[in-house]
Amino acid sequence: MTDFRTLDDAGPLQGKRVLLRVDLNVPMEGGRVTDATRIERVVPTIREIADAGGRVILLAHFGRPKGKPDPKDSLKPILSTLSEKLGRPVAFGEDCVGEAAASAVAALKDGDVILLENTRYHAGEEKNDPDFAKALAANGDIYVNEAFSAAHRAHASTEALARLLPAYAGRLMQAELDALTKGLEAPARPVIAIVGGAKVSTKIDLLENLVAKVDMLVIGGGMANTFLHAQGKDVGKSLCEKDLAETAKRILAAAKEKNCTIILPVDALVAREFRANAENETVPVDAVPSDAMILDVGASSIATIDGAIEEARTLVWNGPLGAFELTPFDTGTVAVAQHAARRTKAGQLVSVAGGGDTVAALNHAGVGEDFSYVSTAGGAFLEWLEGKELPGVEALRAQG
């Protein structure tokens, strides 16, 4: 983390107006928050700044209101949950810039917290407009970015604003950057990556970057079928992007050149129906019945993956190994996740995981708390794994 300034570098916060960019893009139903994870994760930083006498001004986006106010994308319904989790009142500003924001911020006392309305109510936000960023900056003395999940987008509140005020990484951002550095940039070796999920097409850049950086790469989920097909195996009615066979071959060749061991399933749990508890059998991957589909890795594959994890000192995981939302096709994902969690708890493995399905799969396996770090930042986590620069992170680095 030496490249980034954190709250430790910000000096006394007493009386300072702190523009804190957070991710409050939480799922809502009927005007109520259904999963408060993202709110809970930013509470410690809000509390730390407020307890130090800072005036906390929360900036966030919600939904996709297309650059103009839309009541369904208002942040106001989040206020009660935010206040409850924080254990103190939170004021609300009807706009994030202009007179409404200025007067609301002017009324703050040391230690107060205010949430300003959706930054995406203004077209300048997604355009990274310098004038809009200046209007945001007018209400703050320093800027703290706590929204790693939005760091892959060069928006006014994540990028341009960070260049107008003294800028720092919040505690959550700091933890995320620390974890990712340990996972890929300066890892303890050997490093194993597990990449699953349905499609190769969405993860080509990711796979190409990983084969150059990791020692072992496990390919699972629906995307493994494309690789098996590329090797000339019949995958029956399984999900398979046959038009990407050449891409799969290219990735396999690149892995060989970089001395990255590719681990593909050797056996599979197959069924004729895509539903929970469908009649199933375990078969070798070169004997998949033509009317069946692969829905999980088999016992021999699990043993191979577990053995590889035994050798590794670092694990990076993105995507499930099978259709984990349907029993018993969650067996592979659950078994491997629990094995990785045991190694992590024993201090033998640094485990970093991220991506929506991955977080859900680890929670389903009951090990969401046992990995070294689980990132809630879907797109930003993927782009980091792809080796891309993240504008919101680079803006913090530039001042470091």
From Swiss-Prot:
Binding positions (substrate): D23, L24, N25, R38, H61, F62, G63, R64, R120, R153
PROSITE patterns cross-referenced by the UniProt entry: PGLYCERATE_KINASE
Classification via Pfam families: PGK
Reaction(s) this enzyme catalyzes, per UniProt: (2R)-3-phosphoglycerate + ATP = (2R)-3-phospho-glyceroyl phosphate + ADP
Enzyme Commission designation: 2.7.2.3
Record keyword Ribonucleoprotein present: no
Biological-process GO terms, alphabetical: gluconeogenesis; glycolytic process
Keywords, sorted A to Z: ATP-binding, Cytoplasm, Glycolysis, Kinase, Nucleotide-binding, Transferase
InterPro entries recorded: Phosphoglycerate_kinase (IPR001576), Phosphoglycerate_kinase_CS (IPR015911), Phosphoglycerate_kinase_N (IPR015824), Phosphoglycerate_kinase_sf (IPR036043)
Record-level GO cellular component terms: cytosol
Superkingdom to which the source organism belongs: Bacteria
A GO MF term: ADP binding
Compartment list: Cytoplasm
Chief location category: cytoplasm
Residues the entry annotates as binding ATP: K203, E325, G355, G356, D357, T358
The protein's annotated pathway: Carbohydrate degradation; glycolysis; pyruvate from D-glyceraldehyde 3-phosphate: step 2/5
Record text on subunit structure and interactions: Monomer.
HAMAP family to which the protein is assigned, alphabetical: Phosphoglyc_kinase
Family: Belongs to the phosphoglycerate kinase family.
Name of the protein in question: Phosphoglycerate kinase
